Amino acid sequence: MTSNVQLSETNSPRNQKTRPRAEKEEVDYMQRAQWLRAALLGANDGLVTVASLMMGVGSIKEDVKAMLLVGFAGLVAGACSMAIGEFVSVCTQRDIETAQMKRAIEHKTSLSAIDEQEEEEKKERLPNPGQAAIASALAFSVGAAMPLLGAVFIENHKVRMVVVAVVATIALVVFGVTGAVLGKTSVVKSSVRVVIGGWMAMALTFGLTKFIGSAAMQI
């Protein structure tokens, strides 16, 4: 008798309404987390790319204009590349999900009002390629602007190089901590990973550019 009452309660209209709502809230939360992680990765890419370019140019030229021009060119090129790549990727994902939804509808002989509402909600939750492209470009630009702003007002070359490295390191730590909080992982491990990766990129760009630049000048 008790089990029948419990079954009737779980199958009641009120519980059936609250379940989709809870599932929708969970999906919305997951989508927000994915957007935040994507923005974080884009900003990290922009930071490491432009800081590495500036360090590479700074290894062979002390002119602040050259560093800033190369950094700005890297910002524009990287933001455009990220936007185009994200747009194409999201368009492909949207096409695949739309095709799957059409096939699912074709398999059903008749759709109830609830099914139609669910299909409409699924269509509304499909990613927007334009929004994804703009968000990716903005995230990359924010990260790329940090080393540029750190170097723009410093005339001394050595101090400028140190400031770029310090600004990049601080930003990498912030990105690592934020990523760990979003992913609920170890803050220390995530921060160390991100910082070491950024340092390696800057060091390799600095070393290889200096080596090739010095060899080219001797020819």
Swiss-Prot record:
Positions where N-acetylthreonine occurs in the chain: T2
GO biological process terms held by the UniProt record: intracellular iron ion homeostasis; intracellular manganese ion homeostasis; response to iron ion
PANTHER family: FE(2+)/MN(2+) TRANSPORTER PCL1
Lineage: Eukaryota, Viridiplantae, Streptophyta, Embryophyta, Tracheophyta
Sorted UniProt keywords: Acetylation, Ion transport, Iron, Iron transport, Membrane, Transmembrane, Transmembrane helix, Transport, Vacuole
Species assigned in the record: Arabidopsis thaliana (Mouse-ear cress)
Family as reported in the entry's similarity comment: Belongs to the CCC1 family.
InterPro entries given in the database record: Ccc1_fam
Ranges facing Vacuolar side: 59-67, 155-161, 215-219
Name the UniProt record assigns to this protein: Vacuolar iron transporter homolog 2.1
Localisation: Vacuole membrane
Additional note from the record: Can mediate sequestration of iron ions into vacuoles when expressed in the yeast ccc1 mutant.
